[in-house]
Amino acid sequence: MAGQAGQAAQRVAALRNEIEQHNVRYYVHDDPSVSDAEYDALMRELIQLETDHPELVTPESPTQRVGAAPLAAFGSVRHAVPMLSLGNAFDPDEVQAFDRRVGDTLRGAGLLRVDQQPEYFCELKLDGLAISLRYEDGVLVQAATRGDGQTGEDVTANVRTIRAVPLRLKGAAPRVLEVRGEVLMNRAEFDRLNRSQAARDEKVFVNPRNAAAGSLRQLDPRITAQRPLRFFAYSWGEVHGLPGRQTALFDEPAPGAREESTLPRDTHGAMLDWLAELGLPVNTRHNRRAVGAEGLLAFYEQVGRERPGLPYDIDGVVYKVNSLPAQKVLGFVARAPRFALAHKFPAEEATTRLLDIEVQVGRTGAITPVARLQPVFVGGVTVTNATLHNEDEVRRKDVRIGDTVTVRRAGDVIPEVVGPVPGKRPADAREFVMPVSCPVCGSAIERPEDEAIARCTGGLFCAAQRKQTLLHAAGRKALDIDGLGEKLIDQLVDSGRVKSLADLYSLNAFELAALERMGKKSADNLVAAIDRARTPSLGRLLFALGIRHVGETTARDVARHFGSIETIMDADEEALAGAPDVGPVVAGSIRRFFAEPHNREIIDLLKAQGVHPVPEAGPQGNTLAGKTFVLTGTMPNWTRDEATRHILAAGGKVSGSVSKKTAYVVAGEEAGSKLAKAQELGVTVLDEDGLKALLGV
């Protein structure tokens, strides 16, 4: 038993850590790292473990709160009434179990007859960003995001720009009214926004929710004002001081209210009608009442049929006990009300014919099989292409050209091929064969051992990788070409002026000045920066080539060991593995890179343009040679890059994690877990002054 309890505790800790990481990505950065279905599965597993082992429940568990802490860029707002999440259901059995619990509780409280079923108010689960609007004496005074449910971000200035949000309520408004609702963007308006963003060469959004969240959380309200945001109210928080009619039907809509609330209506539906009378937008298109589990499931099925025709995205429906006195009796658990349930839709699926499998070359050379499909309507859009991820996935799913396949919009965003439909494979179906050469540049395609991704080896030559290669090469840690950024590289490549790294060195100020957002002074400065990059250190040049697995430190070590680019190009794997800290994986990567004729050709072109790397300087002394440093926190004067350069110049190494092999940890302000780890292992800890003294700077 002790062993099982220990295993449960370990799994609970792992789940909490993973869920919190996903929460930060979803709630704070608006950049979800997993699909809703994957997140829900993790949360359900954690809930079950905590149910089985109640001694493991802690106030910090993700099951006891919602989301993640807000960013520091906005002011914080403490919710007087917590903005709780909802429990989820994924199948009819869970909906029926919810209905039974509600009915049993209300019958026990005398609010339902034995032969009577609960009445519910059913709504769409809008896929946007939850916010709370605070009105005082009818005037909008504050708007906040959900945040972690207890504390959100102050987005008042941005919300005031949303035309659907009234700045002053109509009629006799209460002294205090908190309105909860969803900010979202219609699909048609989302498409127009993305077309406009693309035309201005600005970031396009992944989906309407991402666009709505990103628009609402802009630091500049003027940007928010230009975005087609909508708002629908669906609930409330604090309600105090109703003029002329004081009732106490509902003491607190959730734990934490500052004083007793008074509401004008006794059902959830009637409260939404009241909010609409005050001038707040309420989504009434599909809202309706239903009785018992049978009514709930009928609503769910009807909305599922009508979902593709909706102007906005939804990811489920919401059921709420309609009677407010009944809601009060049912109450809350730590993170969700007992009187409400979200019934989620599965990722939408459809079947179609797989016409072909082609390969797509990514910006880093990754080769991805892409299914070309007979057009099919899935998840509100027409899908003609879908990812197959990698060669192993194609084999595992046994997908063949000519198959009838199931297509799913994973997470309602990214179309993917789930697999073939059993029994519908034609006699002439063909297996996919990974090409041996890149379809873009003709360079060899190789798949390193123990890796799922095949890659084009023509990094410096391949047009598909050109922009990313140039951006990396121009970086501060590589050739350090100041002024050569992403948008300028886009212009140079798209116009055909630059087809390889060597072409940069033939640019002149006259042709640069003709580009968009480039004047004579900027062009002159860029040409000067390119000229300075004709004599980089050998380590910088090697790093600039973008060889897989070769980072800044490895490039410097290899450069010091071999002394010239020619020696590195001609070294075999055994010789390369003889360089400091170069194992077989890195040695193989370097060897494959220079075995590709196109890459060797680029080196020759660089030489022809007058690029002559200088030998890498050796360490200034050998007292720190081979010593490993870890940097954590913020130093008063040096940046991390500056500290790293000084350490490397002294022969030391810089690592990202603390271990028994770490010689020194340099800790600045707000040092985190790395400092604690160093103290635990007895590693020497230095501040900035201590580091400078050690380096003799």
UniProtKB/Swiss-Prot annotation:
Organism: Bordetella petrii (strain ATCC BAA-461 / DSM 12804 / CCUG 43448)
Domain of life assignment: Bacteria
Binding, NAD(+): D36, A37, E38, Y39, D40, S85, L86, E123, R146, E182, K320, K344
Keywords noted in UniProt: DNA damage, DNA repair, DNA replication, Ligase, Magnesium, Manganese, Metal-binding, NAD, Zinc
Binding site for Zn(2+): C438, C441, C456, C462
Gene Ontology biological process terms from the UniProt entry: DNA repair; DNA replication
Protein name: DNA ligase
Active site residues per record: K125 (n6-amp-lysine intermediate)
Cross-referenced PANTHER family: CHROMOSOME TRANSMISSION FIDELITY FACTOR 18, DNA LIGASE
Enzyme class: ligase
Record-level GO cellular component terms: cytosol
